Amino acid sequence: MPEPIGKPGDVHDRGTGRVPGPAICGRRGPLVGVIDHGSGNLHSVCQALQKAGAHPKLVSETRMLSAVDAVVLPGVGALGTAMANLRRINGVQQVQELVQRGERPVLGICVGHQMFFEQGTERDETVDGLGCLPGTVVPMPTSRLPHMGWNTVHPPADTALFTGISGERFYFVHSCAVVTVSPCALAHVEGDAAALAHTGDDATDPETGTGTASPGAIGHTAAGPESAHAMTGRNGHPVRTTTTCHDGCTFVSAIECGRLCSTQFHPEKSGPAGIQLLRNWLAMV
């Protein structure tokens, strides 16, 4: 497990001892602060960042975020719990300001992705998010929950986050999502419903090898002539929306908005495609 930022020492790998930071052009890669708010797949995230060429450090005191080159906000479980944990470490305003200034790349993963939106609903209660992106997180309107396993993504043509990634699948584990940002947000998905069809969600966990494959579902596109770039985030940049279909439900699976990026899927569990996505994000440093 990586040591907290501000303490001497490099990232540690369970079972192998000390692991030196990767060398890029004769030096270590970007110093990435992984926010430890008590809800996140921290060990796997840090290992994946190392493979992508970064030097990850856990940050439990958000005032230390000024010392890093980029920031990851991970999260698992419930949105309300994750937001409460972030408030507990006085991180809400700091993360909002990071996104607003746009000086460092910021990446949200899974519930961390959901935290950047305006609000969410869970158990008939409304939870305020960080408000950096337009949209509401809701329980997905399908009986096949959780959405767990491998699935395809459909990014817009001009996204930097998916450069060099085509036709790959990513690993999802979630029951809530931003099903609709606005009618125009999903309009970039080209082609007819067949273009979004997939052969099935492989529910095998890439780390444990457990799980089963579930039947496939035919996707659908959202109607509307408007461009997804009609929306802007709090930082003033256009919102580039990537979508995924599960059991007939199209939802937002990734966002790129200036130097703010977020993914509903887990890049750290998504094999080579996930590592390439992290490299693309690190290129924004």
What are these regions (language model features)?
Residues 68:
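An anion/phosphate-binding loop that grips the pyrophosphate of nucleotide cofactors and donors
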Residues 29-33:
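Extreme N-terminal starter segment of soluble prokaryotic enzymes
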Residues 77-150:
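Cysteine-nucleophile active-site neighborhood
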Residues 55, 105-107, 169:
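Structural signature of beta-strand start/N-cap positions in the alpha/beta core
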Residues 46-54:
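Two-component/phosphorelay signaling modules centered on CheY-like receiver
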Residues 24, 135-285:
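Amide-donor transfer/coupling interface in amidating biosynthetic enzymes
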